[in-house]
A protein has these predicted regions:
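Functional beta-strand-loop-alpha-helix junction segments that form "active/interaction loops"
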Residues: 46, 56, 88, 93-106, ...
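Surface-exposed, short loops/turns at beta-strand junctions within beta-sandwich domains
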Residues: 109-116
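Caspase-like (clan CD) cysteine peptidase catalytic core
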Residues: 154, 193, 210-234, 238-301
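Active-site-proximal C-terminal subdomain of hydrolase catalytic domains
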Residues: 161, 203, 281-346
């Protein structure tokens, strides 16, 4: 998927678009690795149905062994998902430190949520080919209800909108208005659903990289597995020369042609992925109303739409989170004076 996924491939082929064949010799493609997830807790309540292993537990934590093997390659990464969301558990991202081994085992402890916990492991080899997943289910029922377990989930909102960039060439008209309208709608709509709503709102000069990262770290420290996290961003989004997707905070001075500066001041897809893994909230939604101003849009920028769409699709799939984006392939998000908003948020 990481190498060969092409957004909207069939309709683009039917429209007559020509694609350069990938520079891959099919004879060099290695077999997919295998992976096995083993529950190391009490197994007296084990149920097996259609090869799916289901365990019952009164402990709030589950100890797991994950073993990955590759017959003709090495293991480069092991991923663990809990109820569909990528997690880190007790290891450092489950990345294999010794990339030369054909077999690797990771042991980690997972914090369970009350009820059903579907735990899925996936291994990747050096060519980034994924294994067939290994899945177990742990049904957690606490032996005794604690008072703090009776508190409902919290909604964590991080909302960013940038109209006035440090570089005036990139000024937008309605990003801040869009962000404000979204904040108001979410606060009003969440009152009957969540026990608490925690909101961080960053606009214009407040929306530099340092402040956005600090706000993400705050959510990482406070969000619980039963909570929900929503990240909303209205501003510029670009693909670098190295084909990496970046959000563009207030203090980015150049969108194209300086990847080092973009990496220093921008927020990359890789950084978003790391925060998503480390934030414990299992329900996560990322909304990107990211566009390019007329001053920034040129033939190079327009041609990167497909690469941006691919980057977002890979990010959503790898993290197990949900993403809504304003622009599709070779499009840019529109702003309308008669609406007073960008079309996507409106």
């Amino acid at each position: 998927f990481e190498q060969f996924y092409t957004p909207s491939l069939l309709p683009r082929l039917l429209q007559g678009e020509n694609f350069t064949p990938p520079a891959v010799d099919i004879n060099t493609i290695k077999k997919a690795p295998t992976v096995k997830i083993t529950y190391k807790g009490e197994t007296r309540n084990l149920e097996v149905a259609d090869d799916d292993q289901v365990y019952a537990s009164s402990s709030p934590k589950a100890l797991l062994d994950i073993t990955a093997s590759s017959a003709d390659d090495v293991i480069s990464e092991i991923r663990l998902y809990q109820n569909g969301k990528l997690i880190t558990g007790g290891t450092r991202n489950l990345v294999v430190e010794d990339a030369g081994k054909p077999t690797d085992t990771k042991t980690l402890e997972v914090e369970l949520t009350e009820g059903e916990n579907i735990l899925k492991a996936v291994a990747l080899n050096s060519q980034r080919t994924e294994s067939k997943p290994s899945v177990i289910t742990v049904n957690y029922k606490p032996a005794k209800k604690e008072d703090n377990n009776l508190v409902g989930p919290t909604l964590h909102l991080l909302i960013v909108g940038v109209n006035n960039y440090k570089n005036p060439k990139y000024t937008l008209n309605y990003a801040s208005a869009d962000a404000t309208a979204f904040k108001d709608a979410m606060e009003n709509g969440s009152k009957e659903i969540f026990s608490k709503t925690s909101v961080t709102f960053l606009s214009d000069a407040q929306a530099g990289k340092d402040n956005i990262v600090a706000a993400l770290n705050k959510v990482k420290e406070t969000a619980a597995p039963q909570d929900m996290f929503v990240f909303y961003y209205a501003g510029h989004g670009v693909i670098s020369d190295a084909k990496e997707f970046f959000l563009v905070p207030y203090d980015v001075l150049q969108l194209y042609g300086n990847d080092d500066a973009l990496a220093q001041k921008g927020i990359s897809a890789e950084q978003l992925q790391e925060f998503s893994k480390e934030i414990k909230a299992q329900k996560q939604l990322f909304i990107l109303d990211a566009c390019q101003s007329a001053g920034a849009l040129n033939e190079v920028a327009a041609s990167r739409g497909a690469a941006e769409e691919k980057a977002i699709a890979q990010l959503a799939r790898s993290t197990g989170t949900h993403w809504l984006t304003a622009s599709g392939s070779e499009q840019f998000a529109s702003e309308f004076a008669q609406l007073g908003h960008g079309s996507f948020t409106y």
